[in-house]
Amino acid sequence: MGTMVHIVEGTHHTYKNFFTKEECDHIISIFERDKDIVPYGTDTGYEGLTSTYSEYNWLYNKDIQPLNIPQRLFDLDYFSDWEYMVVQCWGNALHVGEELKEHYHGEIMEEHFRRMYFINCNIFLGGEYNKTWYKDIGYTHNEPGDLHLFSCELDHRVDHNIGHNTRYSMALDIYPDSNRMLMLPDKHMSRYSIHKRPII
């Protein structure tokens, strides 16, 4: 299903204004509205909104779907030769003093996706503290709507939030192989979503 996609180690691209400021504010409002009703993971090693990644995909949220995020990803030049993408999408809300320790996304527990190269995206949504550290480029300052796209072996982190408000971002893991999605146990279907490039 689909054509073979080769993901190069060390891939890292930045796209400005993937979301508008208004869209970022909208997503933040949905995160805040629904944070107490979405399922949370209990053994992810993370707390708060980040821990929902193992149980819930925000692309299924009826108030985020109108943003048509999968189509907008297909429209990025990096994905120009992708026919399918399997997407996991979650939110991060770092309150004052909280952090995301250095990590990379290639070390995953799901057997169906293990040993498979894939793409990560971080989209900064808002907050006074806007720095992210990536192993290849060091610290970068983000504006609301900025998207960083990078291969899954790249270490990255967010240091302690020293701003005066909560820092919000959206994260996505994006896989090119839809066949593996079809083999997933039903219990994971709420975690991943499959998308096909629209025929124009």
Task: Please annotate each region the language model reported.
Residues 1-83, 191-200:
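Non-heme Fe(II)/2-oxoglutarate
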Residues 81-188:
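Catalytic core of non-heme Fe(II) oxygenases with the double-stranded beta-helix
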